[in-house]
């Protein structure tokens, strides 16, 4: 079963949050939380809180779930409305200040986590190009 967590109108830019998502996607929740605990970015605190909230949601919705089996199925960040402010500039003009917001969505799953596919190593032999026909 899937459990969805949404953090809306977060006062951190979308790109700042998106930098940390590869450390969370596809990981077990305990491993994702420990990954985020070592990161200095403010968005890591918010992501960690969101994952813990997802664990609490999963336990509340189905009482017999083991939190160790939960893993992050998907995690993405969307653009939210921008707060527009004005800063006074020279000669009576104004410069815009754009305070960007974001929405975070995390989906946790207790289904069996798929195995990562192993890439096949290329053979040491290099194929030769076919010779051009003689005229």
Curated annotation (Swiss-Prot):
Keyword annotations from UniProtKB, A to Z: Ribonucleoprotein, Ribosomal protein, RNA-binding, rRNA-binding
Q: Name one GO biological process term.
A: translation
Q: Region annotation Disordered: residue ranges?
A: 112-135
Q: What gene does this protein come from?
A: rplV
A Gene Ontology cellular component where this protein is annotated is: cytosolic large ribosomal subunit
PANTHER family per UniProt: CHLOROPLAST 50S RIBOSOMAL PROTEIN L22-RELATED, LARGE RIBOSOMAL SUBUNIT PROTEIN UL22M
Pfam families named among the record's database cross-references: Ribosomal_L22
- GO terms of molecular function: rRNA binding; structural constituent of ribosome
What assembly does the database describe for this protein?
Part of the 50S ribosomal subunit.
Family listed: Belongs to the universal ribosomal protein uL22 family.
Which InterPro entries has this protein been placed in?
A: Ribosomal_uL22, Ribosomal_uL22_bac/chlpt-type, Ribosomal_uL22_bac/org-type, Ribosomal_uL22_sf
Q: Which SUPFAM superfamilies is this protein grouped with?
A: Ribosomal protein L22
In this chain, composition skew of type Basic and acidic residues spans 124-135
Function per UniProt:
This protein binds specifically to 23S rRNA; its binding is stimulated by other ribosomal proteins, e.g. L4, L17, and L20. It is important during the early stages of 50S assembly. It makes multiple contacts with different domains of the 23S rRNA in the assembled 50S subunit and ribosome.
Q: What is this protein called?
A: Large ribosomal subunit protein uL22
